[in-house]
UniProtKB/Swiss-Prot annotation:
This is Elongation factor G. GO terms for biological process: ribosome disassembly. It holds the Pfam family EFG_IV. Transmembrane segments: none annotated. The keyword rRNA-binding does not apply. HAMAP family: EF_G_EF_2_B. It is found in: Cytoplasm. The keyword Aminoacyl-tRNA synthetase does not apply. The gene is fusA. Present in outer membrane vesicle formulations which are used as vaccines in human. Catalyzes the GTP-dependent ribosomal translocation step during translation elongation. During this step, the ribosome changes from the pre-translocational (PRE) to the post-translocational (POST) state as the newly formed A-site-bound peptidyl-tRNA and P-site-bound deacylated tRNA move to the P and E sites, respectively. Catalyzes the coordinated movement of the two tRNA molecules, the mRNA and conformational changes in the ribosome. One of its GO terms (cellular component) is cytoplasm.
Length: 701
C-alpha cells in the first residue's frame, strides 16, 4: 500500500494550555474546521470530542491526551491537503506526567493562553517541558471576546514570565464584545469570519483606520524577526528592499523550528474566530516529521548510540506513549512511528523487555471513534490492539535492527493511600482494575501491605489518586473505601550489639531445639538494607540450618519493634550457636533467629526513619520570603536558590514527606497560584524524638 500523504505534509502537534484557557474548545474547533465533527462540542455542556473520559466531562478538565487525526488544506484551500495528528494534553499539575509524555512524541505545539488570565503557573511548567524536549511552538491567545481581554499584555507576559521571544503574525481587531477578527500582518489585510457558517468562510477587508499605525509597527517587528534568519535577508532588509511574503514565511519557519522565536496569533475559539488562521500557521510554521533531527536511541546489543531518520525506507521503530482501556476492544496502545512501516499482523521486538509482540489490529483515532487501518508509516501516530506486554515509554522496533529510543523519565509517586473493596465481589475486580490502570500510568503504583494485607495505591498527588479511584468505579464497577494519605516510615539500629536466643521445647515425643548467637551492626544508610554473614566455625551449627537463620531474620524485618515498620540498614553476623542431633530442625532455627534479632534490636538503640523529599519550588520573586518561611515551618532545610530563567526564583530544599500533605493547596493560596513545585524522594533520615513518639503512639493507638 503506497503512502497516501507525503511525510512532508504531516503535522504532529500538541494543544497545550493552563486549565480554563479554552484549550478543549480550541481543539474542538480544529476538529470542526478540519471536517471531522459536524456539531460543535462545547466543554460547557460536557460534549467535547477530545474529553472522552467521563470524569473529564464532569470536572471540565482534560485528563488524558487523546490523539486525533484530521486534515487541513488552508482557509482559502491554498495548500495541498495536510494531515494533522493532534494530541490534547492535560493542564492540571497532577497530570504533568501526561504532558511530559505527549511532549516526547510531538513535533510542534500550540500553546493556548487566555487573553484575560495570560501566562499562568501551569503554562510555565508546560513551557519548561517543551524546552526540555526542544519542541517548536506557536502561541494562540484565546478568549479575545471576554471582558478584560488584552492581547498585547500576553505578549509582554510571554517575554517576562517565559523568557520567550514572541512574534505576532496577526493582531486583534477590537477586543471584548467588539472583537470581530484579526489583521493578518503578512497580507496587511483584516480577516472577518462569516458568523452564519460558524467561521467556515471569511473575507479579506481593509485594516480599520484606527489600527493602521499599530499594524505597521507590529509588521515591522515581524519583518525584523524574519530578517535575522540569514545575512542575505538582513542585507536586503537593511538595504531598504521589501521582503516578499514567501521570504518572510520561510524565514519565520526557519527560526521557529530552531526554537529562536514563537509566532503568535489570537482569536476566540468559542466565537469561531481566529482558529482557522492558526491552522494555516501550523502548516506554514510548524515542523513536519522530516524537519526535526533523527530520533536518538541506543542499540541494546552494543550499548552504542544509534538513530533513525523519519523515512519509510528505514527499519521500523516506534515509541509506545499511551495506554488506554477501551470497553469494546480492550487495551489500546498508542504508538508514534519514527521510522519504517508496520502492518497489522507483523511481529516486532519490544527492545526494552527483549520480548516479541504481534501487532494485532491498527486503528486511527478520531477522538472517540476509530478507523481500522492496515499499516502505519514513519511520522504517523496510531493505536495498536492486542499487544500483550508493552508499557508506556517502551520501544517497538524491527527484530533485525534493535534500538531503544530515549527512555521517558517518570517521577516516583509520593503519596500512598489504602483502598479497601466494599464487598467480596469487588475484591477480585479491584485487583484487575488496579493492574490495568498501573499499566496505563507509570506514575501510579499498586502494592499490598504485608502487615495489614491492605492494598496501597501510590501516585503524584491527591487529585491523581482521586481520579484513579473514580475510574475504578466507572470503568470496572469497583466500589472502594479509601483511607487517609500515609507516609512510609522505616526503622533501623544505631549501635552494634550481640544477641543470643535458645529455642528449646520438650513436650513428649520429638522436641525443638535451635540456638543462635548473632552480632548486629548498623550499615551505611540507603545501602543494600540488609546483609547476612555466616561466620560459623567448626560446625557448631550444621550447614543445612544456616539458611534457616537467614530466613528467620528476613521474615522478621518487615515488622520492627519501634512502631512495626520495616527494618533497614542492618548487618547480621552469625557467630555461634548449638544444635541437637534429634530435636533441631529448620523451623527451630528460624524461630531462634527471629527472637535473637528482636532481642538485639531492643538493645541496639532502635530509631525511626522518615522519608525526606527533594522539593523544588519555582516562584515569582515577590513571594520568595513566604515560600522559604513556610518550608522552614515544615521542618525543611533550604539548600539553595537559583534564577529559574523566566524571571522568578527556584528554591531547592529537603523536607520530610509527613509535612508536605496539602502543600499544593497552601502554596497556591500563598502565591495566588503563581508558584509551582515538584518533589521526589531523596533519602531516609532519622526522625526527631517528638515525631517518632507521635508516630509510635498513633500506630499503637
Amino acid at each position: 500500500m503506497a503512502r497516501k500523504t507525503p511525510i512532508s505534509l504531516y503535522r504532529n502537534i500538541g494543544i497545550s494550555a493552563h486549565i480554563d484557557a479554552g484549550k478543549t474548545t480550541t481543539t474542538e474547533r480544529i476538529l470542526f474546521y478540519t471536517g471531522l465533527t459536524h456539531k460543535l462540542g462545547e466543554v460547557h455542556d460536557g460534549a467535547a470530542t477530545t474529553d472522552y473520559m467521563e470524569q473529564e466531562q464532569e470536572r471540565g478538565i482534560t485528563i488524558t491526551s487523546a490523539a486525533v487525526t484530521s486534515y487541513w488544506s488552508g482557509m482559502a484551500k491554498q495548500f495541498p491537503e495536510h494531515r494533522f495528528n493532534i494530541i490534547d494534553t492535560p493542564g492540571h499539575v497532577d497530570f504533568t506526567v501526561e504532558v511530559e509524555r505527549s511532549m516526547r512524541v510531538l513535533d510542534g505545539a500550540v500553546m493556548v493562553y487566555c487573553a484575560v488570565g495570560g501566562v499562568q503557573p501551569q503554562s510555565e511548567t508546560v513551557w519548561r517541558q517543551a524546552n526540555k524536549y526542544q519542541v517548536p511552538r506557536l502561541a494562540f491567545v484565546n478568549k479575545m471576546d471576554r471582558q478584560g481581554a488584552n492581547f498585547f499584555r500576553v505578549v509582554e507576559q510571554m517575554k517576562t514570565r517565559l523568557r520567550a521571544n514572541p512574534v505576532p503574525i496577526v493582531i486583534p481587531v477590537g477586543a471584548e464584545d467588539n472583537f470581530s477578527g484579526v489583521v493578518d500582518l503578512l497580507k496587511m489585510k483584516s480577516i472577518i469570519w462569516n458568523e452564519v457558517d460558524k467561521g467556515t468562510t471569511f473575507t479579506y477587508g481593509d485594516i480599520p483606520a484606527e489600527l493602521v499605525e499599530t499594524a505597521e509597527e507590529w509588521r515591522q517587528n515581524m519583518i525584523e524577526a524574519a530578517a535575522e534568519a540569514s545575512e542575505e535577508l538582513m542585507d536586503k532588509y537593511l538595504g531598504g528592499d521589501e521582503l516578499t511574503e514567501e521570504e518572510i514565511v520561510g524565514a519565520l519557519r526557519q527560526r521557529t523550528l530552531a526554537g529562536e522565536i514563537q509566532p503568535m496569533l489570537c482569536g476566540s475559539a468559542f466565537k469561531n474566530k481566529g482558529v482557522q488562521r492558526m491552522l494555516d500557521a501550523v502548516v506554514e510554521l510548524l515542523p513536519a516529521p522530516t524537519d526535526i533531527p533523527p530520533v536518538q536511541g541506543v542499540n541494546p546489543n552494543t550499548e552504542e548510540a544509534d538513530s533513525r531518520q523519519a523515512s519509510d525506507e528505514e527499519k521500523f521503530s516506534a515509541l509506545a506513549f499511551k495506554m488506554l482501556n477501551d470497553k469494546y476492544v480492550g487495551q489500546l496502545t498508542f504508538i508514534r512511528v519514527y521510522s519504517g512501516v508496520v502492518k497489522s499482523g507483523d511481529t516486532v521486538l519490544n527492545s526494552v523487555k527483549g520480548t516479541r509482540e504481534r501487532i494485532g489490529r491498527l486503528v486511527q483515532m478520531t477522538a472517540a471513534d476509530r478507523t481500522e487501518i492496515e499499516e502505519v508509516r514513519a511520522g504517523d501516530i496510531a493505536a495498536a490492539i492486542g499487544l500483550k506486554d508493552v508499557t508506556t515509554g517502551e520501544t517497538l522496533c524491527a527484530e533485525s535492527a534493535p534500538i531503544i529510543l530515549e527512555r521517558m523519565e517518570f517521577p516516583e509517586p509520593v503519596i500512598h493511600i489504602a483502598v479497601e473493596p466494599k464487598t467480596k465481589a469487588d475484591q477480585e475486580k479491584m485487583g484487575i482494575a488496579l493492574n490495568r490502570l498501573a499499566k496505563e500510568d507509570p506514575s501510579f503504583r499498586v502494592r499490598t501491605d504485608e502487615e495489614s494485607g491492605q492494598t496501597i495505591i501510590s501516585g503524584m498527588g491527591e487529585l491523581h489518586l482521586e481520579i484513579i479511584v473514580d475510574r475504578m468505579k466507572r470503568e470496572f464497577g469497583v466500589e472502594a473505601n479509601i483511607g487517609a494519605p500515609q507516609v512510609a516510615y522505616r526503622e533501623t539500629i544505631r549501635k552494634a550489639v550481640k544477641a543470643e536466643y535458645k529455642h528449646a521445647k520438650q513436650s513428649g515425643g520429638k522436641g525443638q531445639y535451635g540456638h543462635v548467637v548473632i552480632e548486629m551492626e548498623p550499615m551505611e544508610p540507603g545501602g543494600e538494607g540488609y546483609e547476612f554473614i555466616d561466620e560459623i566455625k567448626g560446625g557448631v551449627i550444621p550447614r543445612e540450618f544456616i539458611p534457616s537463620v537467614d530466613k528467620g531474620i528476613r521474615d522478621t524485618l518487615p515488622n520492627g519493634i519501634v512502631a512495626g515498620y520495616p527494618v533497614v540498614d542492618v548487618r547480621i553476623r552469625l557467630v555461634f550457636g548449638s544444635y541437637h542431633d534429634v530435636d533441631s530442625s529448620q523451623l527451630a532455627f528460624e524461630l531462634a533467629a527471629s527472637q535473637a534479632f528482636k532481642e538485639g534490636m531492643r538493645q541496639a538503640s532502635p530509631a525511626l526513619l522518615e522519608p525526606i523529599m527533594a522539593v523544588e519550588v519555582e516562584t515569582p520573586e515577590e513571594y520568595m520570603g513566604d515560600v522559604m518561611g513556610d518550608l522552614n515551618r515544615r521542618r525543611g532545610v533550604v539548600l539553595g536558590m537559583d534564577d529559574d530563567g523566566i524571571g522568578g526564583k527556584k528554591v531547592r530544599a529537603e523536607v520530610p514527606l509527613a509535612e508536605m500533605f496539602g502543600y499544593s493547596t497552601d502554596l497556591r493560596s500563598a502565591t495566588q497560584g503563581r508558584a509551582t513545585y515538584s518533589m521526589e524522594f531523596k533519602k531516609y533520615s532519622e526522625a526527631p524524638a517528638h515525631i517518632a513518639a507521635a508516630v509510635t503512639e498513633a500506630r499503637k493507638g
